[in-house]
Amino acid sequence: MKLVLKEVKVYKYKCFLNEQKVAIDPKTTTIVGMNESGKTSFLSAIAKTNYFDDSDNDFKFDTTHDYPRNELIDFEEDDEDEGKIVSCTYVIPKELIEQINKELEVDVFNITEFTYNCNYRNSKITLSGIEADDRAFIEHLSKNYELSEPTKKVISELKSIDKVSELKAAEEDTDLSAFKAEIAKYANNPTGWNNLGHHIYITYIRPAMPKFWYFDDY
């Protein structure tokens, strides 16, 4: 099950000086336009968001080569400029959503689309719209463990799985250590974003994103 690219926004990239939004029809196979109209830049920008060959440095964003040249110096001196390059909005197929909830054994994810953002300031990708119901997931898993009523009450108020590690054991919390260990399997991101949404993205969404291939010789 692959995600479907729904929309692309190009902000500042090569010949693109102003934001351009393009809706992508699933049936589109060809982009037609006049010479120097931006077709090559548009397609290469999309390709660089998730190129099929991770080792190809020609398809990684580079400020010096990709930012519009006549605005590059101003950009480098303007710390308030966010440095947006391109945003791709994807549709998550119903079948994948059902698979996620089935494998997690509780209905915690119902997002149908999200946006994948690339930025000159930070090479890390940012995502908009990937959210899950951490509270429902925590409560669901906690039912399998011997825990005190006070601890169960605290658990019912937790909004993120990364907070489970902070729970303090009461005398009746026979299984708290085991519960923490189980939750830790889903909250193991050392870079910061450490909720159930991250686990779902890494485990299910990211592998389902289409890879892009760009070439200009034929």
Label every model-predicted segment.
Residues 1-51, 62-72:
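Pre-Walker A-like glycine/lysine-rich segment at the N-terminus of P-loop NTPase domains
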Residues 20, 77, 204:
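Beta-strand elements of modular eukaryotic interaction domains
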Residues 85-218:
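Electropositive, glycine-dotted interaction segments
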Residues 19, 28, 83-85, 212:
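A common structural microfeature
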Residues 44-112:
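Conserved P-loop NTP-binding catalytic core
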Residues 35-38, 50-52, 58-60, 70-71, ...:
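Short, surface-exposed, polar/charged, turn-prone segments marking secondary-structure boundaries
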